Amino acid sequence: MDRGVLPQAIALLLAVCSFGPTAGLAEGVQCDLQPVDPKVTYTTSQVSEGCVAHVPNATVGVHILFLEFSKEVSTLELTVQMTNPNGARPQEVLLILSVNKNIHLTLQVPEIPLHLAYDSKLVFLQEAPKAVITELPPSTTKNQLFLWANTKGSIISAAELDNPQSILLRLDQAPTSPSRCTLEPRKDMGHTLEWKSHTQASVLGCHLEGVTGHKEAHILRVLPGSEAWPRTVTVEVELSCALRDPEAVLILQGPPYVSWLIDANHNVKAWTTGEYSFKIFPGSNIQGVNLPDTRQGLLEEARKLNASVIASFVELPLASVISLQDRSCGSGLQPSPTTVQITPPGEGCNQDLLLSLIQPRCSDDVMTLVLRKDLISTLGCTITSLTFWDPSCQAEDTDDKFVLRGTYSSCGMKVAENVVISNEVVVNLLSSSSPQRKQVQCINLDSLSFQLGLYLSPHFLQASNTIELGQQGFVQVSMSPSIPELMTQLDSCQLNLGPDVEMVDLIQNQEAKSSCVSLLSPSPGGDMRFSFLLRGYVVPMPTAGILSCTVALRPRTWSLDVHKTASTRLNIVSPGLPDKGLVLPAVLGITFGAFLIGALLTAALWYIHSHTRHPGKREPVVAVAAPASSESSSTNHSIGSTQSTPCSTSSMA
C-alpha cells in the first residue's frame, strides 16, 4: 500500500473502534479556554439577511449584494458562475454592489450579457470586465436600493454580508424558491451564494487538568442553520508537526442532517455526529455517535477520550467547507497573550493596493490624480513624495489628500492627437528604499467626436435617415481623429422607439444580440460597422426612433475602458409609403413599368382593330358572369404581407 494512504487507512480502522470512557475521571472538567494559534476558516451560505426568488420568465434578473466592511480598504474576490449554461435564465443579468467602504475588486464573470452597478468612488476594479457599468444612485439606503432595483428587472437574489473576502454567486435559479424576493434574517442562500469572511473564526484552547499523555483534541461545533436539509460539510485538517507525531482526535458536532467528509494530512481519530467518511475512501460511510450540543459537554467528551490538550475549540455557522491549520501540533499549548493582531514589519505597507488607487483623470488640458490620506494610512503606508516622471512636478500636500496635476505640455506628458495622455507616477515610501512606479494614461474625451450613419446598402455610399420595416440597415460608427494608440469596439447598440415601446437591443457586451444582427469587418479606415434587419413585428407601427451606440475606448497599454455614445434619429416607415425620396433603382423601375404598360396597350388596340368585323357579320355575344371574387381575393390578401426571414428575434422582441 502507498505510504500516503497507509496512515489514512489506519485512521479509518481506528475510527471504527469504540472509544470507551476512561475510568477514574473526575466529574467536572477544569479547562480555561484561551485564544490559541491554530487557524480556522470556513465557507458558508449563511448570511445575516437575504432572499432567493424563482422568476422563470424574467427578462432582466437582478442580484444585489449589500457588503459591510470594517476596514477603510479591503480586497474582495467575486466569482459569478452559470452552472447550467443551457438552463433557463434571464436574457440579461444586473449585479448591484452596495459597499460602505473602499474595496479592491477582482471580478470573474461568465460570457453572458452582464450589467454591473456600483459606486465608482468606492469600488476599484483590478481590470475591466465584459460588462456594462452603471453608476449607483448617490446616498441610497437599503430600501431605496431595493426600489431602484425593482425598476430595472426582477430581483432573483439579495444578500447582506459582513467583511467578505471571497464570494461565489451562482446565477442558476432555484425552482423551489418563492416568486418574490423578500429579505429574511439569518437566511441560508443554499446553492445560490457561498462566501468566505476576512474575519477569522475565534479559536480557543486549554489544558485538561488531571489527564496525562500527549493526545490532543480538535473540536469543531457547527451550529444549526435556518433551514434543515441534508448536506455534507468538508473538513480539511492540516497538522504540521515538526518535533513529533502526536495522537489527534477530531470531534465534529453538528445538526442531525449534517454528514462529514474528512480530508486530513495526519493520523486523526474521528468522533462525530451523523455519518462521516474520509476523502481517500469517499464511499465508505461510517455511522457516528450521539454527542452533547454544549461546550461543557464536548469538553467532557474530549476528556473521556484521554485528550490532555484541547488544541482548538471552534463554534461556526453552518458551513460547506471548514479548514483547520495547526502548526504547533501538540508541542505545548501556547495561548495568545492578547487578541490584538500585530502587523509584521515586512507587511506594513500594501504597495499593490496603494498603486491600484492611482487613477488619473483628464479634462481641460490637465491630468489630475488624488490620493486620500485616510486610505493611505489604512494601508499602512507613509508617502514621502509623489511626483510625475518629471520630479519637478510634485503633488500638493493638503490636510486630507495628495493632489498631483500637470498640463499636457508639462511634467513629461506624452500626448497622442491631444486625446491619449500618458505619464509615469513615482511614489516614494518611508518603508521602501526604492520608489514605486506606475504607468498612467487617460483619455481626453473632449477632443474626440463620433459620427453614426445609417446606410441602405453594404457599400456605405450614401447615408439615410429613413428605413422601411423588413429592410436591412447598415450602420457605421466613425471616430475623429483616428488614433492608432486607441482601440475602439462597439460595446452596445440600441434602437429607442419611445416610452411606450420596448427598447430594441442590437448589440450587447460587444456581441450581436440575435441572428438578425451581424457584426461586420471594419472599414479600411477602422470605422466600426454592423448590419441589422428590422422586422415588422419588432416595430409595431411606422414611427420615429433614435439609434444609439456606445463605443468602448481603450489605450493599448491600459486595462480599463472608457465609453462614449453616438446617436442618430431615424424615420421608420411601412413598405411602399412615399416617405423616402426616389433613388436610381426606383426611377429605372418606374420608367420600365411605363414602357411595358404602353407596349401592352398598343398591342391590345391593334388586336381589337384587326378583329373588328362588319356589324352585319358579327356573331351574337353571350354574356358571361364575372369570375367569383375568390380569384381576386387571394391576390388582395397578399397585399401588405411581409416575407418571413430566417433570423430569430426572440431576444429582441
UniProtKB/Swiss-Prot annotation:
Disulfide bonds: 31-206, 51-181, 241-329, 349-381, 362-442, 393-411, 493-549
Region (OR1, N-terminal part): 27-44
Domain ZP: residue ranges: 362-512
Stretch list, region OR2: 45-198
Biased composition (Low complexity): 625-634
Ranges for region OR1, C-terminal part: 199-329
One Pfam family from the record: ZP-N
Keyword match Chloroplast: no
Residue numbers of Phosphoserine PTMs: 641, 644
InterPro entries for the chain: ZP-N
Listed transmembrane segments: 582-606
Residues on Extracellular side: 25-581
Miscellaneous: Lacks a RGD motif, contrary to the human protein.
Domain comment in the entry: The ZP domain mediates dimerization.
Quaternary assembly: Homodimer; disulfide-linked. Forms a heteromeric complex with the signaling receptors for transforming growth factor-beta: TGFBR1 and/or TGFBR2. It is able to bind TGFB1 and TGFB2 with high affinity, but not TGFB3. Interacts with GDF2, forming a heterotetramer with a 2:2 stoichiometry. Interacts with ACVRL1. Can form a heteromeric complex with GDF2 and ACVRL1. Interacts with BMP10. Interacts with DYNLT4. Interacts with ARRB2.
Name assigned to this protein: Endoglin
